[in-house]
């Protein structure tokens, strides 16, 4: 897996600019609503990343729409195009469940993959660019950062692209996660993490092991693209996001110890927020416009107190917005879809393709095509999708089709649903399952149902009737008409060729 190498975010921006994938905006633009409007229009048109050099009221530039096209996501992962992300998925599938070598030759063949992983621990630096400027105590003022307000009814400015670094009390490896953070004071943010996410689990374990003690936490903004994307990729629990970022980049991830705690953050990050969560300190978060296209309801989450801000000289603030697809998370979903396919195929070799339509909020609906081998096979695959990766815990609908259907073409999928399904026989309903608390359609916050649709051809045992045979064209006739097609001049305004 040959990787394009970027040492930091600035390296990546330089390459994007050289390829016409970055636009500098010198006109003053307000982080309150205006940047969102410009970024949204640009993303919908397949446009470039945007660097707002003069946000109104601030001296720090704002980077937006960085991963606004699948191509830029692939480039951030060190690949030339989206199709190459299948190779990233194959590597992750191997790391998630490596098969023991079948013999000496197989061991020799697998050795490069093992060496790749073993050679990718982090590189710890004594000093780092992210600590060129340091403020602490009363000098900490988050209002100096051009944090965006994305939608008219949002509760407050919102940090969206922060890499939250945590470590549980019984773990050597750190966790990297991306959780939105509402600004509620000059040194206070609300950490919105769902209970099953790595940061929340680390915090729960800390509270159990150290009652009443402050939980150390750091947030990195503007890390290199491989590290950012490593935090949103289904990395095996045995592999750190930093090590995975090193695999993508082809070089070890450089980290530095924080000023105020023992956590390690990306050395090249533009900005780092250091601080703690006081056990029991909670605050109401929201409402915010989110990836569903609606404002979510208010809920309580822990408060993150910032004690130190470290940053690079001339730091860049990296931000985004979320809204009804398409938005940047939806684009990320389209690209990461290619990573998921080999991981699922490793566990379920019968899967031909897997697709998360972006219009389905990137994870709430999945279409799977399989090489069906027995009656009931589609139901096994549904259950597998819901249970195998925690990324699909909140997928509400799974549609399973045969491999003659294109999972990415709604014409094909709807044809299969309407011709191969009996609603009563082929619909699976599962009640009282975990659901994203942002899903207001569920009857209870965080708990709802799931639906599986078996749109495959039915086998003996699944139906008593003779099954329909698809219409297929006569290949000889097709070849003959191909040969005389131009002479027919049907699309040539009636003129002879």
Swiss-Prot record:
Belongs to the UbiD family. This is 3-octaprenyl-4-hydroxybenzoate carboxy-lyase. Catalyzes the decarboxylation of 3-octaprenyl-4-hydroxy benzoate to 2-octaprenylphenol, an intermediate step in ubiquinone biosynthesis. GO terms for molecular function: 3-octaprenyl-4-hydroxybenzoate carboxy-lyase activity; metal ion binding. The gene is ubiD. The active site is at residue 290. It catalyses: a 4-hydroxy-3-(all-trans-polyprenyl)benzoate + H(+) = a 2-(all-trans-polyprenyl)phenol + CO2. PANTHER family: 3-OCTAPRENYL-4-HYDROXYBENZOATE CARBOXY-LYASE-RELATED, FERULIC ACID DECARBOXYLASE 1. Its main location: membrane. GO terms for biological process: ubiquinone biosynthetic process.
């Amino acid at each position: 897996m040959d990787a394009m190498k970027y040492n930091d975010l600035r390296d990546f921006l330089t390459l994007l600019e050289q390829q016409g994938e970055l636009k500098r905006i010198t006109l003053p633009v307000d982080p309150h609503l205006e940047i969102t409007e410009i970024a949204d229009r640009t993303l919908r048109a397949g446009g470039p990343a945007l660097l707002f050099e003069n946000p109104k009221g601030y001296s720090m530039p704002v980077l937006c729409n960085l991963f606004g096209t699948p191509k830029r996501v692939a480039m951030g992962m060190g690949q030339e195009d989206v199709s190459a992300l299948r190779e990233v998925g194959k590597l992750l599938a191997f790391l998630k469940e490596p098969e023991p070598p079948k013999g000496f030759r197989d061991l020799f063949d697998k050795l490069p993959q093992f060496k790749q992983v073993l050679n990718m621990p982090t590189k710890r630096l004594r000093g780092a660019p992210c600590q060129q400027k340091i403020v602490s105590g009363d000098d900490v003022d988050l209002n100096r950062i051009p944090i965006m307000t994305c939608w008219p009814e949002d509760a407050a400015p919102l940090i969206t692209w922060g890499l939250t670094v945590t470590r549980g009390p019984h773990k050597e490896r750190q966790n990297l996660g991306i959780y939105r953070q509402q600004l509620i004071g000059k040194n206070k943010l609300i950490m919105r993490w769902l209970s099953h996410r790595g940061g929340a689990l680390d915090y729960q374990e800390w509270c159990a092991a150290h009652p009443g003690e402050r939980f150390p936490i750091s947030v990195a903004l503007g890390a290199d693209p491989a590290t950012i994307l490593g935090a949103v990729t289904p990395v095996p629990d045995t592999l750190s996001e930093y090590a995975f970022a090193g695999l993508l980049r082809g070089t070890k991830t450089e980290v530095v110890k924080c000023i105020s705690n023992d956590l390690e953050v990306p050395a090249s990050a533009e900005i780092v927020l250091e601080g703690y969560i006081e056990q029991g300190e909670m605050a109401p978060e929201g409402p915010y416009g989110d990836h569903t296209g609606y404002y979510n309801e208010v809920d309580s989450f822990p408060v993150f107190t910032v004690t130190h801000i470290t940053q690079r000289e001339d730091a860049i603030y990296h931000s985004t917005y979320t809204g009804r697809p398409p938005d940047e998370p939806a684009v990320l979903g389209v690209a990461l879809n290619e990573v998921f396919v080999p991981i699922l195929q490793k566990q379920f070799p019968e899967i031909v393709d897997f697709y998360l339509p972006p219009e389905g909020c990137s994870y709430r609906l999945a279409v799977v095509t399989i090489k069906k081998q027995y009656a009931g096979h589609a139901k096994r695959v549904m259950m597998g999708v819901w249970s195998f990766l925690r990324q699909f815990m909140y997928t509400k609908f799974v549609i399973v089709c045969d491999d003659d259907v294109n999972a990415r073409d709604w014409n094909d999928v709807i044809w299969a649903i309407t011709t191969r399904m009996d609603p009563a026989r082929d619909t699976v309903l599962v009640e009282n399952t975990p659901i994203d608390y942002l899903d207001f359609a569920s009857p209870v916050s965080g708990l709802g149902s799931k639906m599986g649709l078996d749109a495959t051809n039915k086998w003996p045992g699944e139906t008593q009737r003779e099954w329909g045979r698809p219409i297929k064209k006569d290949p000889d006739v097709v070849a003959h008409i191909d040969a005389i097609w131009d002479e027919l001049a049907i699309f040539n305004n009636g003129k002879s060729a």
